[in-house]
Amino acid sequence: MAAFLQTNIRLEIIPGRYSSLTDHKFRAPYRIRCAAASPVKKRYNITLLPGDGIGPEVISVAKNVLQKAGFLQGLEFDFQEMPFGGAALDLVGVPLPEETSTAAKQSDAILLGAIGGYKWDKNEKHLRPEMGLLNIRRDLNVFANLRPATVLPQLVDASTLKKEVAQGVDMMIVRELTGGIYFGEPRGITINENGEEVGFNTEIYAAHEIDRIARVAFETARKRRGKLCSVDKANVLDASILWRKRVTALASEYPDVELSHMYVDNAAMQLVRDPKQFDTIVTNNIFGDILSDEASMITGSIGMLPSASLGESGPGLFEPIHGSAPDIAGQDKANPLATILSAAMLLKYGLGEEKAAKMIEDAVVDALNKGFRTGDIYSPGNKLVGCKEMGEEVLKSVDSKVPV
C-alpha cells in the first residue's frame, strides 16, 4: 500500500502594498506552503491571479488539484495570490499593479483565472481589465500561445457538430501573442479632412516575430502527428505575405513535418466542416484569437479548454480560454476543468513535471467517465454538479492514482 503522507500548512504574510487593506479580499499577498513529512525533491513559486467573475472560484479549485498532484509527485509549491484585472482596478486603480507584475516575473509560473466584467466596460481603454492581460503578456514576453482543442469521447455529444464530425478531433492551435494588430502602431481615433471620425489599427509583424512562433509550431507539430497548417490572409494582407514567406522558408529545417497553408476564411469554414484534418495550426494574433474560440465549441464547451503562453525564457502564463462569466459568478456553476487542465499545462510546459501533469489529465478523464458534469456540458443520464463538487471529484481521482 502507498504510504500515508501528512501535509503541514503554514501561512506566511508578506509585507507589501496591500497589507493594510484588511477589509478587502486581497488582505495581503500570501503564500501557502505545503510541506510533506517525507523529503521534498523540488519546490516552485507559483503566482495566482484569480481576477474577476468566476476567476476566484476556478482558481481555488485548480490550486487544490495542482497542490495534490504535486504533493504526490514529491513537489512543493509556494503560492502567492495577487490582484489583477478588475479586482486590481477596484483595489488600486490599475488593472496590472507593479507589485503583481513583479511577483509574476519572479515566479516559476503564473496561473490566471479570468478577467473582465460589465462593471468596467465603460472605463477608458487603459483602465479596462483586458489591458492588464495584454500588459502582463508583454511584461513576461510570452509570445507563443498554445491552445489544445480535443473532443473527449465522454463529451462528444456536447459538441455542436454531428457526432461523426466531432469524434476524434485533437488539434493544437499555436497563436502568436505579442505582435500584430493588437499591438501595432500607429493606432487611434482621429478626425479626417472631411471632419469624420476615423478609427485605425496596424497589422505589423517583423521577420523575427514570425520565425520564433513558427519554430514553436514546427516543434509542436513534430511532437504530435507531424502536420502543420499555417493560417494567413496572404491574398490580401502584406503582413500575411511576409508571414507565409517566412514560415515556408523555415519548413526546410523540419523535413519530418508536413506544412500546408490556408487562408483564414477557409480555415474558419474547414474547422466546422472537417476539423479532424487539422493537427497543429499556427497563425497570427487576431486570427488565433478568433479561430481558437471557434474550435472551443467543437469540443462542447469553452469551459473545457486550457491554454499556455510561453516565451523564450522566464515564467509561462497559464489560463483557461473562457471569460469571467459575471452572470454566474459566485453561484458555484462554473466549469473548473479548463483551469484544472491549465494547471496540468503549467506542470508540463512551465515546470517540466510531466508525471504530475499526466495525473491531473487522467483525473479529469476519470471524473468525466464517472458521469460528473457541470451545467455547460451536462446531458441527461449524467450527474449535474457545481464547480466545487467537480473539483472534489477530480481531487479524488488524483488521489486514487497514488502508486502502490
Swiss-Prot record:
<feature type="binding site">
    <location>
        <begin position="115"/>
        <end position="130"/>
    </location>
    <ligand>
        <name>NAD(+)</name>
    </ligand>
</feature>
<comment type="function">
    <text>Involved in leucine biosynthesis; catalyzes the oxidative decarboxylation step in leucine biosynthesis (primary metabolism). Catalyzes the oxidation of 3-carboxy-2-hydroxy-4-methylpentanoate (3-isopropylmalate, 3-IPM) to 3-carboxy-4-methyl-2-oxopentanoate. The product decarboxylates to 4-methyl-2 oxopentanoate.</text>
</comment>
<dbReference type="InterPro" id="IPR004429">
    <property type="entry name" value="Isopropylmalate_DH"/>
</dbReference>
<comment type="pathway">
    <text>Amino-acid biosynthesis; L-leucine biosynthesis; L-leucine from 3-methyl-2-oxobutanoate: step 3/4.</text>
</comment>
<dbReference type="InterPro" id="IPR019818">
    <property type="entry name" value="IsoCit/isopropylmalate_DH_CS"/>
</dbReference>
<dbReference type="GO" id="GO:0003862">
    <property type="term" value="F:3-isopropylmalate dehydrogenase activity"/>
</dbReference>
<dbReference type="GO" id="GO:0009098">
    <property type="term" value="P:L-leucine biosynthetic process"/>
</dbReference>
<dbReference type="InterPro" id="IPR024084">
    <property type="entry name" value="IsoPropMal-DH-like_dom"/>
</dbReference>
<keyword id="KW-0100">Branched-chain amino acid biosynthesis</keyword>
<feature type="binding site">
    <location>
        <position position="289"/>
    </location>
    <ligand>
        <name>Mg(2+)</name>
    </ligand>
</feature>
<feature type="binding site">
    <location>
        <position position="293"/>
    </location>
    <ligand>
        <name>Mg(2+)</name>
    </ligand>
</feature>
<keyword id="KW-0150">Chloroplast</keyword>
<dbReference type="GO" id="GO:0005829">
    <property type="term" value="C:cytosol"/>
</dbReference>
<keyword id="KW-0028">Amino-acid biosynthesis</keyword>
<keyword id="KW-0479">Metal-binding</keyword>
<feature type="binding site">
    <location>
        <position position="265"/>
    </location>
    <ligand>
        <name>Mg(2+)</name>
    </ligand>
</feature>
<keyword id="KW-0432">Leucine biosynthesis</keyword>
<keyword id="KW-0464">Manganese</keyword>
<feature type="site" description="Important for catalysis">
    <location>
        <position position="182"/>
    </location>
</feature>
<dbReference type="GO" id="GO:0051287">
    <property type="term" value="F:NAD binding"/>
</dbReference>
<dbReference type="Pfam" id="PF00180">
    <property type="entry name" value="Iso_dh"/>
</dbReference>
<dbReference type="GO" id="GO:0000287">
    <property type="term" value="F:magnesium ion binding"/>
</dbReference>
<keyword id="KW-0520">NAD</keyword>
<feature type="site" description="Essential for redox regulation">
    <location>
        <position position="229"/>
    </location>
</feature>
<feature type="binding site">
    <location>
        <begin position="319"/>
        <end position="335"/>
    </location>
    <ligand>
        <name>NAD(+)</name>
    </ligand>
</feature>
<feature type="binding site">
    <location>
        <position position="175"/>
    </location>
    <ligand>
        <name>substrate</name>
    </ligand>
</feature>
<comment type="subunit">
    <text>Homodimer.</text>
</comment>
<feature type="binding site">
    <location>
        <position position="265"/>
    </location>
    <ligand>
        <name>substrate</name>
    </ligand>
</feature>
<dbReference type="GO" id="GO:0009570">
    <property type="term" value="C:chloroplast stroma"/>
</dbReference>
<keyword id="KW-0560">Oxidoreductase</keyword>
<keyword id="KW-0460">Magnesium</keyword>
<feature type="site" description="Confers substrate specificity">
    <location>
        <position position="134"/>
    </location>
</feature>
<dbReference type="GO" id="GO:0009536">
    <property type="term" value="C:plastid"/>
</dbReference>
<feature type="transit peptide" description="Chloroplast">
    <location>
        <begin position="1"/>
        <end position="34"/>
    </location>
</feature>
<feature type="binding site">
    <location>
        <position position="235"/>
    </location>
    <ligand>
        <name>NAD(+)</name>
    </ligand>
</feature>
<protein>
    <recommendedName>
        <fullName>3-isopropylmalate dehydrogenase 3, chloroplastic</fullName>
        <ecNumber>1.1.1.85</ecNumber>
    </recommendedName>
</protein>
<feature type="binding site">
    <location>
        <position position="266"/>
    </location>
    <ligand>
        <name>NAD(+)</name>
    </ligand>
</feature>
<feature type="site" description="Important for catalysis">
    <location>
        <position position="233"/>
    </location>
</feature>
<keyword id="KW-0809">Transit peptide</keyword>
<comment type="similarity">
    <text>Belongs to the isocitrate and isopropylmalate dehydrogenases family.</text>
</comment>
<keyword id="KW-0934">Plastid</keyword>
<dbReference type="GO" id="GO:0009507">
    <property type="term" value="C:chloroplast"/>
</dbReference>
